[in-house]
Amino acid sequence: MTTSSHGTAPFLPGEHGELLQALAEQRTLLLITVRDITDAQAAQRTTVSELTLGGIVKHLTRCEQVWTQIMVKGEGELPEGMLDLEQYRMVEGETLAGLLEQYTAAAQGTEESVAALPDLGRSVPLPKTPWSPPETVHWSARRILLHVIRETAQHGGHADIIREALDGASTTAQR
């Protein structure tokens, strides 16, 4: 199985492949959005939001790592760092290139883990979080993957707004 740094998922037949391809397409749009920016630009706030382009890449990396771990382990345990607010911002010493390398590695890990799952209908208990109901909630592996796709698409839209405010570029104008 191979994955390019441009967000192309490996070919897998059926639902596994279709969902991974949808995720890869959203990753590709994010990579277009952050193309040709400096580390300083990646760390710069351009709206009243705390979000930055680098922070979005960092968060989506952590998002894939955490949700893949939840999906694969299926233990309902809160992964270390899931609630860490540092995942939303670039810190001193981080570079966009380094964050993108980590994002590519997380993407490959997601793809390998999903490809190895025999059943996307597998029920997984979600970890307890401050926003979850008191009872244990279960999602299918499929729903977890759909959540990762939604997170990537939603934050990709945020990234596009931040980029346009930064230098006038947008994802569609760069294609």
Can you describe what each PLM-predicted range is?
Residues 2-9, 16, 20-35, 39-86, ...:
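Short, contiguous alpha-helical
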Residues 88-127, 140-153:
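Acidic/histidine-rich alpha-helical segments that form the ligand environment
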